[in-house]
Regions:
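Chalcogenol-based redox active-site neighborhoods
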Residues: 1-146
């Protein structure tokens, strides 16, 4: 695990990233920011996976999707993320049955800047570890699972 992974009580980093929010032509992408959940008074649940088009990741993502309503009922914004591009995310969603109807955005951290600030990049390939963060309405990290 990275040496300086952000933990409980740390401020979740500010970010503005492109995400896949739909598979509808012309409406696939949107900018998601760290302020979006705060202005709505919601908690942030952001989970990370290493790479798209792998075998384990879709199962985890599909389970988060199955539970998306539970997160919404608890005033939490759910975001999935990896260091793959928004175009790879969109292709993966189109290609995989379990990912076509996702109810949450797939964030593209192509610059790896957010993963780096969180301290969750692997040393070799520079892809994200499997990690889940929960931050409160003020952006303070309240739970981490790695």
């Amino acid at each position: 695990m990275a040496n300086h992974m952000l933990g409980l009580g740390s401020q979740f980093p500010t970010f503005s990233k492109t995400a896949v929010v739909s598979l509808e032509q012309g409406k696939e992408f949107a900018t998601i920011t760290s302020e979006d959940h705060k202005k709505d008074g919601k908690w942030l649940v952001m989970f990370w996976w290493p790479k798209d088009f792998t075998f384990v990741c879709p199962t985890e993502i599909a389970e988060f999707n199955r539970r998306a309503g539970d997160f919404a009922d608890r005033d939490a914004s759910l975001i999935g993320a990896s260091t793959d591009s928004e175009f790879v995310h969109a292709a993966w969603r189109r290609d995989h049955d379990d990912l076509r109807g996702l109810k949450f955005p797939m964030l593209a951290d192509t610059s790896k800047s957010l993963a780096e600030e969180l301290g969750i990049l692997t040393e070799g390939e520079k892809v994200a570890y499997r990690v889940t963060y929960i931050a409160d309405q003020d952006g303070v990290i309240r739970w981490v699972s790695a």
